[in-house]
């Protein structure tokens, strides 16, 4: 069996914990029954022992199978392309992939809602797992332990230019930097900007995104711990990025632009930040896929 799951970028400025989109950079997971348990990891995380001994994919996969009475062993080849602990949804890709794979082996019908709400057990914020399951741009929240979400597709004439620093940022640790309370003014600012940004994406009003993607809840505090991120954002917006936001909790930075502007934006960012990876990516509208039964 082969299952693939895309990278994601969440928050997108004002949409803290509720907005996210999918990027066409896929982890592929190859699973087959075996007499013994075996894991091989290729790509991102390769050669790091903890990703083999404490692997979230195999943990979730086996837990679901055992819950349904299957105690078999499997051989896993995990082909990782999504950077790990860089704010591009690597954990969500693993969790969603594990859930989809386990359900397929159990003979369950392919049901994205079922996959999503099972993934929520292991990842309690919907902003990454929802686009990982559905693809596209998603707005989501959790009510009564269930994800409520809507998706819209992202057109092919838009590209993502991702800047991926060589610095790990833990989502859990970065959350401790954030205030426990926000003022009415800050809350209204983010609510209004997230709402209008979503309408702009649905209606194709791309030139509104620069204004709508501003944030007062989380980005500044997180970016202060790694000030070069301010320079990335400034340079991107000076070179035709439609929007430029911290990807998840970082350290990656998400930039959206028109297709014709992507090569120059990549060139400018690569020249200014030669030690960082800069990648032009298509958006993904498919989400998790069973590529081979």
UniProtKB/Swiss-Prot annotation:
Protein's cellular compartments: Cytoplasm
UniProt xrefs under InterPro entries: GHMP_kinase_C_dom, GHMP_kinase_C_sf, GHMP_kinase_N_dom, GHMP_knse_ATP-bd_CS, Homoserine_kinase, Ribosomal_Su5_D2-typ_SF, Ribsml_uS5_D2-typ_fold_subgr
UniProt pathway annotation: Amino-acid biosynthesis; L-threonine biosynthesis; L-threonine from L-aspartate: step 4/5
Protein name listed in UniProt: Homoserine kinase
Enzyme Commission no: 2.7.1.39
Family per record: Belongs to the GHMP kinase family. Homoserine kinase subfamily.
Lineage, top ranks: Bacteria, Pseudomonadati, Campylobacterota, Epsilonproteobacteria, Campylobacterales
UniProt keyword annotations, A-Z: Amino-acid biosynthesis, ATP-binding, Cytoplasm, Kinase, Nucleotide-binding, Threonine biosynthesis, Transferase
């Amino acid at each position: 069996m082969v299952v693939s799951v895309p990278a994601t970028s969440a928050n997108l400025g004002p949409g803290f914990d509720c907005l996210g989109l999918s990027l066409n950079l896929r982890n592929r997971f190859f699973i087959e029954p075996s007499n013994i348990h075996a894991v091989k990891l290729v790509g991102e995380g390769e050669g790091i022992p903890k990703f083999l001994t404490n692997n979230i994919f195999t943990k979730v996969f086996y837990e679901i199978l055992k819950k349904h009475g299957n105690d078999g062993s499997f051989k896993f080849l995990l082909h990782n392309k999504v950077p790990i602990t860089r704010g591009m949804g690597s954990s969500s890709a693993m969790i969603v992939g594990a859930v989809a794979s386990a359900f397929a082996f159990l003979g369950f019908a392919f049901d994205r809602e079922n996959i999503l709400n099972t993934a929520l057990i292991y990842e309690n914020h919907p902003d990454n797992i929802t686009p990982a399951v559905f693809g596209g741009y998603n707005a989501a929240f959790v009510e009564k332990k269930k994800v409520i979400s809507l998706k819209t597709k992202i057109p092919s004439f838009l590209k993502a230019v991702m800047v991926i620093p060589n610095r790990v940022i833990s989502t859990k640790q970065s959350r401790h930097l954030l205030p426990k309370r926000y003022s009415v003014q800050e809350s209204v600012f983010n609510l209004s900007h997230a709402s209008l940004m979503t309408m702009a994406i649905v209606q194709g009003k791309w030139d509104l995104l620069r204004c709508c993607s501003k944030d007062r809840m989380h980005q500044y505090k997180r970016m202060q711990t790694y000030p070069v991120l301010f320079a990335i954002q400034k340079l991107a917006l000076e070179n035709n990025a439609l929007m430029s936001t911290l990807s998840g909790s970082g350290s990656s930075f998400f930039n959206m632009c028109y297709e014709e502007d992507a090569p120059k934006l990549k060139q400018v960012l690569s020249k200014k930040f030669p030690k960082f990876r800069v990648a032009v990516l298509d958006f993904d509208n498919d989400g998790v896929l069973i590529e081979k039964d």
